[in-house]
Swiss-Prot record:
ATP binds at G99, S100, V101, S102, V103, G104, K105, S106. GO terms for biological process: coenzyme A biosynthetic process. It catalyses: (R)-pantothenate + ATP = (R)-4'-phosphopantothenate + ADP + H(+). Pathway: Cofactor biosynthesis; coenzyme A biosynthesis; CoA from (R)-pantothenate: step 1/5. This is Pantothenate kinase. InterPro entries: P-loop_NTPase, PanK, PRK/URK. PANTHER family: URIDINE KINASE (PTHR10285). Coiled coil: none annotated. One of its GO terms (cellular component) is cytoplasm. It is found in: Cytoplasm. Belongs to the prokaryotic pantothenate kinase family. The lineage of its organism: Bacteria, Pseudomonadati, Pseudomonadota, Gammaproteobacteria, Pasteurellales. Its main location: cytoplasm. SUPFAM superfamilies: P-loop containing nucleoside triphosphate hydrolases.
Amino acid sequence: MEELNTIKLSDHLTPFLTFNRQQWAELRKSVPLKLTEQDLKPLLGFNEELSLEEVSTIYLPLARLINYYIEENLRRQTVLKRFLSGHNPKVPYIISIAGSVSVGKSTSARILQSLLANWPVARKVDLITTDGFLYPLEILQKKNLLQKKGFPISYDTQRLIRFLADIKSGKKNVKAPIYSHLTYDIIPNQFDIVDRPDILILEGLNVLQIGTNKSNQMFVSDFVDFSIFVDAEEDQLKEWYIKRFLKFCRSAFTDPNSYFKHYANLSEQEAIETASQIWDNINGLNLKQNILPTRERANLILKKGENHKVELVKLRK
């Protein structure tokens, strides 16, 4: 445990404590891993291989930490309930997970959801992606924003904020729009229903975003209790994106209903060049302009290396 006491000499100069894999894994303590290989498989992303060792090394200590925060939050709610003579509705604990396209946010969110839902203290854990709050394709086309899809301007932010405000106010059966990656559009008249969960995990590119022009404006981050940023070097992110694009060309894009069916007939070299251009002109640009600048606002940063393995964990003091 001596290593933990001397985490990094430079830590006192930053708002974060930095842990390597071994140091972070020690913080799991005696928490058992109930997840099996069979349970893990449906949680993984399309292009990800992630082992149970990664879950026990990285995600179990994280789930343990979050549970401490949740318990503290519940104690605070109990105090408020006493003060208000019992007239205080249950307030869900909101966790946000941000990061670039292809970094593995969705997988991290699903694993965390599974661990938190199966913790010794039974809790209802819902997961919502901000993709459902993108403007419909028709509106993006009218506004000439297709090349900015995923940028903050392409989201109906006010609708997302109303959704989060309803969740935080304890409202029942709150509707969240559903996005289809097949049709590249919002599915009309279909919704996920969020009914007063104990925990809501909100996953998306720009959930840590704040503005600079309106000081009184509300942001998604105003409703978040604990924020996570999944990080990796850009060359690694681009490589993962191209690899995923190639797999999609041989699978999802071959569906006649796919918005991207025109990519299905590309040669491998053409697919690599197309994916590289999309990254450079859209995803990489969004990363540099909008996503990376929000990283330091997170409560916790998971820094990935090769094979989607987390190499460093940075925890806000």
